[in-house]
Every structure is written in C-alpha cells, then in structure tokens.
C-alpha cells in the first residue's frame, strides 16, 4: 500500500491482486499525477467523464466526485478500482465500470486516457470515442515518455483531430487532442482474422488479444502435445483467443470446456472462434471473464491447460502465473492434471513440484517447456489458491 497526494486529495492505493514483498511497485505513476495537474476541473459541467485504462483505479478515485465512467478491457483492473474505492471510503455506486465491449455514453465532457500497451486497443478505443464525442469534448492522454511514440500521436490525429504532446515531466508525457470534423478512413475491422495452420479453422482476434496477428509460438508448441479423450471438464485458463481450447475441444469429444480470461476481448474472441469453427460444440462450452478460477467449484476440473503470462501490463512478474497454479490445484479433482507451457528461464518446474508434490517435463525446446503436475490425495490439503494458501508465494 502507498499513500499519494493527487491534486489536493490524499489517497491510499494498492496494486491488485495484493502481493507480498511488492513495496517497490506502486499502484500509481507519474503519468497519473501529470494528468491530474493538467485537467481543468472547472470545465466539467455535469456531462459524462470517461477514464480509460486506469489499471489500479488511481484516476477514478481522484475524479470520484464527478461520477466517472471507468473503461477497461481488464477485469483485474475493475477489481482493483473497486478495491481502492473501498480502501478510501468512496462510494462505488457513483462509478460506472464499463468493459471494452460496452457502448460509451454520448457527448462526454472530459476523456482521460492512460495509453495502453497494445496500439490496436488504443485504436479501438479512439474509434469508439469518435462515435460519441462532442466538438467541445476535452481529451487528454498520458503515459511514460517511452510509451508515447509517433505512431501514438498519428492515431489521435487520424481518428479524432489535431494533437500535440507536452514536455516530459518525471519521465511522463501527455497528449492533448482536439475533436475535429475530419474525414475518417474506412472503419477498421472489428477483428483480425487468419487461418490456423494445418487445420480448416480461421482464428478471429479482437484488438487486445495477445499475439493478435499470428499464432503465439508458445501456444503452437503446446498444441502439439495436448491430450486426447479426456472425460470431465477441461479449463483453458488465461485462454486468450481460445486456440488451445479449440484444439482440446476437437481432441476430447466427451469433455466440457471452460474458457477463462481476465480480458473481456479475449473471452469474446474465444467465444467467436468456437462459434465460427465448431458451432456444433458450443453446448459443451462455457466462457467466463474472471480473476483466475475464482468462482469455479473446488475439485470440479479434470484438466487445466495454461499458457501463463509473466508480466502484468509493463511490470515483469510471475505472481499472476503463481495464482493460476494455485487456483488450478484448488479446482482440480484428485488425479486431475495441470498442463502448462512456459519459457524455460521461468523455472516453473520447481514451483509446480513444490505446490503439487510432483512435476513432469512432457516436452521442451530451446525456448519453452511443457510441464504436467497431478493433484494427488497427499497434496490435496497442502495449500490451494484463491487467498487461502497454506503455502505463500514468498516460499518460492
């Protein structure tokens, strides 16, 4: 937890999910301060205030009095925003949380954007704004200086209107954009589509899906050794576009599939890919936006497939992967298996062996390893995820 003065208000802010030994990582950054210093709150006239990509709810807390709409593709960011509102005794009911797939309110007065990591997501958001902004809408964006590129400015210019950037302050920069009645090139397609090699499938990806334009090389390696003829329920945890679950669905005709991700666009892409490629199997599928396997019944899964991330936005961390492993252990039946693919340097083997009491390398190459851990009766009571671990992340 860290305390920060934003404008004239002091806030206690935490990253989410909470992490042990994370004192060096703050829930806010200089770009948040810089944005708030440059917003003229006197201009807000009761019309909607929109905040985009507010990772931990910092801007939403600071603008709470103006009943903001907080727009994000990340369910984790929504949980973080709600957490920090509660932490500061702010009324959650006056904040509207919107996903990246939701319609935006008309004629906003103020739009505050934290520049996202994916340029495609920024383009999607700017095009969505173009449909609702008014001529007097104030648009201001911010990010670390290293994340503001010519391509970023060109997107604002092309879609919304005249754009200028500020000098750097504490290694952060701002973008000011005026709404102009400019001709817009043809509408961008809602998804990027490409054929999946060695299959008859076509993969559809929304803007914020990892490896949007081609098959992730880790997923490609993983797909080569997915199991056949599993009975019971299989979870594609951190499913992305659902390509791993799609192949698992084909190879396991008696199984049910659960597609889970914290990205709204990822889950929407997964559902689109099953609908388009295997509509006959939709009745065997469930699609869920969630923080890991929260809400999934204990000991209800036979197999968990996972290609875990090793970063949270720009911060490199395997904490999210660890939470996924713990959730998998909690939700697997005794005898159920967790199969993961990961970069060799991440040393997931020893983490899984410590958590499950066993781990097997199924395949490896110069970059990736595919590992399997089995939930045994003896490991059943030794920790298990979702905040109730006997074994903590710091043990590793």
UniProtKB/Swiss-Prot annotation:
GO terms for molecular function: 23S rRNA (guanine(1835)-N(2))-methyltransferase activity; nucleic acid binding. It is an enzyme of class 2 (transferase). It is found in: Cytoplasm. Its EC number is 2.1.1.174. It holds the Pfam family MTS. It catalyses: guanosine(1835) in 23S rRNA + S-adenosyl-L-methionine = N(2)-methylguanosine(1835) in 23S rRNA + S-adenosyl-L-homocysteine + H(+). Keywords: Cytoplasm, Methyltransferase, rRNA processing, S-adenosyl-L-methionine, Transferase. The keyword Chloroplast does not apply. NCBIfam families: PRK15001.1. PANTHER family: RIBOSOMAL RNA LARGE SUBUNIT METHYLTRANSFERASE G (PTHR47816:SF5), RIBOSOMAL RNA SMALL SUBUNIT METHYLTRANSFERASE C (PTHR47816). Specifically methylates the guanine in position 1835 (m2G1835) of 23S rRNA. This is Ribosomal RNA large subunit methyltransferase G. It comes from Yersinia enterocolitica serotype O:8 / biotype 1B (strain NCTC 13174 / 8081). The lineage of its organism: Bacteria, Pseudomonadati, Pseudomonadota, Gammaproteobacteria, Enterobacterales.
């Amino acid at each position: 937890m860290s305390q920060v003065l934003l404008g004239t208000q002091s806030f206690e802010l935490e990253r989410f999910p909470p992490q042990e030994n994370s004192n060096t990582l703050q829930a806010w950054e200089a770009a948040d301060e810089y944005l708030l210093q440059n917003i003229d709150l006197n201009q807000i006239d009761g019309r909607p205030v929109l905040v985009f990509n507010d990772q931990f709810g910092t801007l939403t807390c600071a603008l709470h009095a103006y009943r903001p709409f907080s727009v994000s593709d990340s369910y984790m960011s929504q949980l973080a925003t709600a957490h920090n509102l509660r932490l500061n005794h702010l009324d959650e009911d006056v904040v509207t949380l919107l996903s990246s797939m939701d319609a935006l309110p008309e004629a906003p007065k103020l739009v505050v954007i934290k520049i996202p990591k994916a340029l495609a997501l920024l383009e999607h958001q700017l095009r969505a704004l173009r449909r609702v902004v008014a001529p007097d809408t104030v648009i201001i964006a911010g990010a670390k200086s290293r994340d503001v590129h010519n391509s970023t400015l060109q997107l604002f210019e092309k879609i919304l209107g005249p754009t200028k950037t500020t000098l750097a302050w504490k290694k952060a920069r701002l973008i000011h954009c005026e709404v102009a009645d400019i001709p817009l090139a043809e509408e961008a397609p809602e998804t990027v589509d490409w054929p999946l090699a060695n299959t008859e499938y076509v993969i559809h990806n929304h803007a914020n899906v990892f490896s949007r334009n081609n098959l992730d090389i880790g997923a490609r390696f993983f797909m080569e050794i997915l199991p056949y003829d599993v009975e019971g329920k299989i979870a594609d945890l951190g499913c992305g576009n659902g390509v791993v679950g799609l192949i698992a669905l084909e190879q396991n005709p008696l199984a049910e599939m659960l597609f889970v991700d914290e990205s709204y666009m990822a889950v929407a892409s997964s559902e689109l890919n099953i609908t388009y490629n295997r509509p006959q199997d939709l009745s065997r599928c469930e699609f869920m936006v969630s923080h890991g396997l929260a809400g999934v019944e204990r000991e209800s899964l036979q197999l968990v497939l996972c290609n875990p991330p090793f970063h949270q936005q720009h911060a490199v961390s395997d904490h999210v992967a660890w939470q996924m492993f713990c959730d998998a252990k909690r939700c697997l039946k005794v005898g159920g298996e967790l199969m993961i693919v990961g970069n060799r340097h991440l040393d997931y083997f020893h983490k899984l062996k410590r958590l499950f009491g066993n781990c097997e390398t199924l395949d490896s190459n110069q970059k990736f390893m595919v590992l399997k851990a089995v939930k045994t009766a003896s490991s059943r009571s030794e920790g298990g995820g979702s905040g109730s671990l006997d074994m903590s992340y710091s043990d590793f």
